[in-house]
Design a protein with these regions (language model features):
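C-terminal luminal/periplasmic domains and tails of membrane-associated envelope-modifying transferases
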Residues: 2-11, 16-19, 476-836
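Membrane-interface helix-loop-helix junctions at transmembrane boundaries of multi-pass membrane enzymes
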Residues: 19-23, 158, 250-270, 348-380
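Short helix- or helix-capping micro-motifs
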Residues: 32-36, 168-173, 180, 200, ...
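Interfacial juxtamembrane loops and adjacent helix segments
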Residues: 55-58, 64-140, 292-321, 482
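Transmembrane-helix motifs of polytopic, lipid-linked glycan transferases
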Residues: 139-160, 197, 201, 357
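Membrane-interface transmembrane helices that cradle and orient dolichyl/undecaprenyl
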Residues: 157-159, 163, 198-214, 224, ...
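Membrane-lumen/periplasm interface segments of specific transmembrane helices
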Residues: 267-304, 451-468
Length: 836
């Protein structure tokens, strides 16, 4: 079989080959297979992606159809998916074989195989035990991927030679996006590597005219169509344009003409189509029994996909980007590249430009460049002719452009090799380099070997969450989350394990997005976080980045939980993927344990049982911020945690209250001045007071932003309930608890302080009047006017200052002196705030 891919050497002018010369060409593919397979097999049970439970269900249906001989029921996907179904069914069958042989029993299986298959596939879309099968269905996918990587290596070796083939294959094998998708059971990975094998074999046929390459190309084109018919159709234009690049630019061998290559291209396109069509028919059993129905079924599915967006489409964080943008994949592609492939692709494009300029100048290209230039151009059009058409399809997903990553990897390898060759040539021209380097020991392979090993090491550090790798040259995942959808289930396994530790053998109900991906790893009951009730009544709630980005299940739920303090956060690669929150928000039993018990009834409808705060003593700058009202229609950025002191109000409902009611929480000093305030609807409007019934206990969490200029001292809380439409108050709970603020660890910047009336008037060199918060007011006899004056000390003060207040008539004359107050010298605090 190796003879298909290898050029037989001629030994007429050579001595008898050594053992290493005979063994090495066979040993390298074996090593590549092992190296490619190991990271794809390790920890296959680590997490389950959002579609894999469905794929296990489809594989079980396919296995049942195959065992019963009912080929009409083998149509289980909206596309053929035959290679994936066969591999998945093989894994499912082997898992059941391990059970019935006694090697690895499944406790829930009590009947024979056919009965079990009928029971597990009874409810479409729900597979109850994915974790029992996930390794068994993923392993065949990983095995096939490793074999195809070896095939790609052998084809590139015929195309480019051993060193460049080895370098480019390592880039392909350890591309994180390719690596991630060749570890899971789905149709996109087989489509991608079948297309690329077909493409490489097609180019080899154009060059050499050997039938074996045309047969390989057609066979793998058929396999690509059997994986996903729609995208595989792009292979025809890709082959035509790639072949045309070889017809026009490839250096002719002795006796060759351009017309000869042109005829070969036309014959190859027709032959490849016929072979691919025959393979499509022969390898898909459903085509044998009902071919017209199958073809019509595929066409209708393609039309449906093009008309409808993905059910989870949405607007990303920031509101300026959506996956319905026609430029979406132009953001997806660079974010999923590595630094090495990014640089390599840019160098390859530079190679095209440089070669074009030289050709326009009638200059002769170097032999290596002239031979590789058609392939570089063909790979560029591979990307363009795939991404362009698929960008017009309504349903979007980053994995839908997986095939182009094989092309970009080889393109990057060619660009890097071209640059390394040029760089070595420049270095060898230096006189000092001649003492240490020679052409023999200065090769591109040696120069680039360390670079590719460094990249492989960096990628393997993400194991097994390769989906979480994003191009660090573009800011990595921290930046990617604002431009493309992130999260396919990775990290939910970690969240489930964290909750298993928290509950410690007494698991409680958890509401989670992607519940089918969370529940296999959680020991308790899981409900889907698809509506408000799941979030309100569950003891724990798990939010996922994919959900938060797209605004599910509702903007109101996301806004409320964004203001809460999570119990735990799951991070992958420095990016927050899952947030675990405590609950329940609504219950029937009070906890009877509060940091600050209150017991005040407001409005005759709500009993404020108590208040909990995150901390009772902390630095004055620990929870600084400004209260903001969100007017954005886009989902809140969960990783950008809302500022402020976490505070929980515990209410017990007495009766429903008509109208729209807000709660405010204030932080006050001993003189009654406000240093922090938050004001919003109870539960951010999730459960309005007009729905209240007696006996409910509400756990309502807030974040109280504290003024950056707040001085150290003793403070207390105040909670009020009022109608924000009419302004009617329903009571205030005053003097709640005691909170101690210690000196700030870092002094605030003057621009961060909320000063309603900013003056910035210099009193003298060390002291500046920043401003005040007094407003115009009409005073009645005996009334008071309270406010704050803000000072800035530019250097330590060496004396005390006295502040004088007076009333001033319209013409400017002083009417009456109100008060003289001495201010204490403060040498350490940058801000001195006088209150009156």
């Amino acid at each position: 079989m190796n003879d298909i891919f290898l050029r037989k050497p001629s030994y007429r002018s050579l001595a008898t080959p050594t053992i290493s010369q005979r063994v090495l060409p066979l040993l390298i593919p074996v090593i590549i297979f092992i190296v490619a397979l190991l990271p794809r097999l390790a920890n296959l049970d680590s997490f389950i992606t959002a579609d894999e439970d469905d794929q296990i269900m489809f594989s079980s249906l396919f296995l049942k159809s195959a065992l019963t001989g009912d080929l009409s029921n083998a149509l289980v996907l909206g596309y053929p998916g035959v290679p994936t179904l066969i591999l998945g069914a093989t894994g499912v069958g082997l898992r059941y074989a391990a059970h019935y042989s006694g090697l690895s029993p499944l406790p829930w299986v009590t009947a024979d195989l056919m009965t079990t298959l009928r029971e597990t596939t009874l409810e479409r879309g729900v597979f109850a035990h994915p974790l029992d099968f996930i390794v068994w269905v993923r392993a065949p996918m990983a095995l096939l991927a490793a074999l195809c990587i070896v095939a790609i290596y052998l084809l590139i070796r015929r195309l480019l030679g051993e060193p460049l083939a080895l370098f480019s294959t390592l880039i392909i094998a350890f591309d994180p996006f390719i690596l991630a998708h060749t570890r899971v059971i789905h149709v996109d990975a087989p489509l991608a590597y079948f297309m690329f094998v077909s493409f490489l074999a097609f180019l080899l046929y154009i060059i050499h005219g050997r039938w074996k390459f045309l047969i390989i190309s057609g066979l793998f084109a058929g396999l690509a169509a059997l994986s996903k018919t729609g995208p595989s159709a792009f292979l025809g234009p890709i082959m035509a344009v790639g072949g045309l690049a070889y017809v026009l630019l490839y250096p002719l061998a002795k006796g060759q003409t351009r017309w000869m290559l042109t005829r070969r291209l036309m014959f190859a396109l027709g032959g490849c189509g016929l072979i691919g069509g025959a393979a499509f028919f022969a390898l898909w059993p459903s085509m044998w029994s009902q071919p017209f129905f199958v073809i019509n079924w595929i066409v209708r599915n393609l039309q449906s996909v093009n008309r409808s967006a993905h059910p989870t489409t949405g607007v990303f964080w920031g509101g300026g980007m959506t996956d319905q943008s026609p430029y979406y994949y132009f953001f997806v592609l660079p974010f999923h590249l590595t630094p090495l492939t990014t640089v390599g692709v840019l160098l390859a494009l530079s190679m095209i430009i440089w070669s074009g300029i030289n050709l326009l100048r009638k200059m002769t290209l170097r032999p290596w460049v002239a031979e590789k230039l058609p392939l570089v151009i063909a790979l560029v059009f591979y990307v363009i002719l795939f991404v362009g058409p698929i960008s017009m399809v309504s349903r979007r997903g980053d994995r839908y452009i997986l095939p182009v990553f094989f092309a970009t990897s080889l393109l990057a390898a060619l660009g890097l090799w071209w640059f390394a060759t040029w760089l070595i040539r420049q270095i060898l021209r230096l006189r000092i380099a001649r003492f240490y380097l020679t052409k023999k020991n200065s090769t591109p392979g040696r120069l680039l070997g360390g670079v590719i090993l460094a990249q492989i090491t960096a990628i393997l550090m993400y194991h097994p969450y390769y989906l979480a790798y994003f191009n660090p040259l573009l800011g990595g995942g921290q930046m990617a989350q604002h431009y493309l959808n992130i999260g396919w289930g990775e990290g939910l396994d970690t969240a489930a394990r964290h909750l298993n530790d928290i509950t410690k053998g007494r698991p409680e109900q958890v509401a989670s997005w992607y519940s089918s991906q969370f529940s296999p790893y959680y020991q308790g009951r899981t409900v889907d976080l698809s509506d408000i009730n799941a979030a309100l009544y569950s003891p724990y709630t798990v939010f996922y980045i994919n959900q938060a980005q797209r605004g599910f299940p509702s903007q109101e739920i996301l806004e409320y939980f964004h203001q809460r303090q999570p119990l735990d956060v799951v991070k992958i690669g420095g990016v927050e993927y899952a947030w675990i929150y405590g609950g329940p928000i609504l219950s029937s039993e009070p906890t009877n344990s509060y940091m600050f018990p209150v017991g005040t009834i407001l409005g005759g409808a709500a009993n404020l049982l108590g208040v909990d705060v995150n901390q009772q003593t902390f630095a004055a700058d620990a929870f600084v911020g400004q209260a903001k009202v969100s007017e954005s229609k886009s989902p809140p950025v969960f990783s950008d945690h809302a500022p402020g002191l976490p505070i929980t109000l515990h209410w017990q409902t007495i009766s429903k209250v008509p109208g729209e009611h807000n709660v405010y929480i204030r932080l006050l000093d001993e003189d009654g001045h406000v240093w922090g305030k938050v004001d919003r609807l109870i539960l951010a409007g999730l459960w309005r007071p007009d729905r209240w019934r007696p006996g409910f206990v509400i756990r309502d969490e807030y974040r109280l932003p504290i003024d950056p200029a707040t001085p150290p001292g003793k403070y207390h809380l105040e909670v009020g309930l009022y109608d924000f439409v009419t302004g009617q108050t329903y009571g205030i709970a005053k003097n709640i608890g005691q909170i101690t603020l210690t000196p700030a660890k870092t002094q605030p910047n003057v621009n961060d302080v909320n000063v309603p009336h900013r003056l910035m008037t210099a009193i003298n060199q060390p002291l500046t009047l920043v401003g005040h918060n007094y407003n115009d007011v009409t005073l009645t006899p005996g009334a008071e006017m309270n406010g704050k004056i803000f000072w800035q000390a530019n250097q330590p003060l060496d004396r005390d200052y006295q502040v004088q207040f007076w009333l001033q008539a319209p013409k400017g004359q002083a009417v009456r002196t109100l008060k003289n107050v001495s201010a204490t010298t403060q040498k350490d605090d940058r801000y001195i705030v006088y209150e009156s």
